[in-house]
């Protein structure tokens, strides 16, 4: 019921992520951790309950820096190069355009089909058309664009890389692929992993046996897995987890088979956590084929509409949880960094929000779900006020 729609989304997303990750050289494999044999399910710690509560409602807005006057930016030109034409990135681009136009800037989006050669063309076009700033949105891998980023820097055009590095990674220029970029807008990959682990601890009553399905050729993935394992180790003595790796290039064709085999090898697994929504399409038929709906719950990260719809349609018995991202919040945070860079200010640590979605609140994302819906307007109104363009209190 969910697979066909999900696969339509994945067919566009897989190509993007495959080129976002440089030549995948990692091979599939697995590791596992288990509780002591004497461990029994303990009461869910208050820290777990508090963490879930923190992320179960609409976002609140922490200003990333002092207020700024954006009036000098009227007429400046921003060039947006998105990584892939999927609803998640399209929603971010729409919010960037909205914020740019409120500041009187000229916004241009370079549509493409997630090919490195097209990203190269985009940067070359931005340089030739004398843009004032370039944003790699979603994000085209800066490690694959070294010569073009050098050329942009030589032309005096700052480049911002968005949603590629984790919040915990070093800042520019020490982050990977950051030699010739100006600033980043990082993403809460590890934070989302910790929140997901907390949800599974609570939902299972402290007995989660989790199959974590990663793609280690995606830059932040190892850190996300470690964040999840640290949460289990700290707050769930009765939990266990096994990690398997599926290289990005194989997500569309091998996720179902690999997950199905892992579930057969370990019948005690009761949660499958895929690090990114693009693998949900393969996890669903893996669980269904083994007739484990209601016994094995699928969870993921990104907040893609099809994944949220699957929660609602299965009432949480098949796809049970998703840690989603506020795409308008991401777009406005990106523009805040853009404004500060163009004003000659130091970049700030932009932080973008997440929300835990499950059957108790997924209706707030819309029916059908829509990207960026259900997170509230705290970020958009907060940024507008910070820029002197209106907004709420």
Name what the model sees in each region.
Residues 20-24:
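C-terminal motif of bacterial Sec signal peptides marking the signal peptidase cleavage site
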Residues 25-35:
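Bacterial lipoprotein signal-peptidase II cleavage site
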Residues 36-76, 235, 326-393:
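Hinge/cleft segment of the Venus flytrap/periplasmic-binding protein
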Residues 39-95, 108-120, 125, 129, ...:
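Extracytoplasmic "Venus flytrap"
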Residues 65, 119, 182-209, 223, ...:
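Hydrophobic alpha-helical segments within soluble ligand-binding/sensing domains
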Residues 79, 130-139, 158-163, 211-212, ...:
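Periplasmic-binding protein-like
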Residues 139-154, 228, 247-310:
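Hydrophobic alpha-helical
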Residues 143, 148-191, 304-316:
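Flexible loop/hinge segments that line or gate small-molecule binding clefts
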């Amino acid at each position: 019921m969910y697979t066909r729609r999900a696969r339509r989304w994945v067919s566009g997303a897989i190509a993007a992520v495959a080129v976002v990750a440089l030549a995948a050289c990692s091979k599939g494999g697995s590791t596992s951790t288990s509780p002591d044999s004497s461990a029994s399910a303990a009461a869910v710690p208050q820290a777990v309950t508090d963490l879930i509560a923190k992320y179960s409602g609409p976002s609140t807005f922490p200003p990333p820096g002092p207020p700024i006057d954006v009036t000098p930016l009227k007429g400046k030109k921003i060039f947006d190069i998105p990584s892939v034409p999927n609803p998640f990135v399209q929603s971010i681009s729409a919010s960037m355009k909205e914020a740019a136009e409120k500041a009187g800037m000229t916004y241009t989006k370079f549509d493409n089909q997630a090919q490195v050669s097209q990203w190269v063309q985009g940067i070359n076009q931005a340089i030739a058309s004398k843009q004032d700033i370039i944003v790699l949105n979603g994000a085209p891998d800066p490690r694959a664009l070294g010569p073009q980023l050098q050329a942009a820097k030589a032309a005096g055009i700052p480049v911002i890389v968005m949603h590629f590095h984790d919040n915990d990674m070093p800042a520019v220029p020490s982050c990977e692929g950051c030699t010739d970029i100006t600033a980043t807008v990082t993403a809460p990959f590890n934070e989302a992993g910790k929140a997901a682990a907390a949800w599974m601890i609570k939902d299972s009553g402290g007995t989660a046996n989790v199959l974590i399905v990663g793609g280690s050729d995606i830059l932040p993935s190892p850190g996300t897995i470690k964040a999840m394992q640290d949460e289990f180790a700290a707050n769930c003595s009765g939990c266990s987890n096994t990690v398997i790796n599926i290289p990005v290039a194989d997500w569309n064709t091998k996720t179902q088979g690999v997950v199905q085999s892992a579930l057969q090898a370990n019948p005690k697994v009761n949660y499958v956590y895929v690090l990114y929504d693009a693998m949900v399409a393969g996890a669903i038929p893996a669980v269904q084929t083994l007739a484990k709906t209601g016994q094995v719950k699928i969870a993921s990260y990104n907040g893609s509409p099809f994944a949220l719809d699957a929660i609602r349609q299965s009432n949480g018995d098949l796809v049970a949880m998703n840690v989603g991202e506020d795409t308008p919040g991401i777009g406005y945070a990106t523009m805040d960094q853009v404004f500060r860079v163009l004003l000659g200010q130091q970049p700030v640590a932009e932080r973008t929000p997440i929300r835990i979605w499950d059957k108790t609140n997924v209706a707030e994302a819309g029916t059908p779900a829509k990207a960026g819906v259900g997170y509230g307007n705290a970020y958009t109104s907060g940024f507008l006020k910070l820029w002197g363009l209106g907004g709420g209190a």
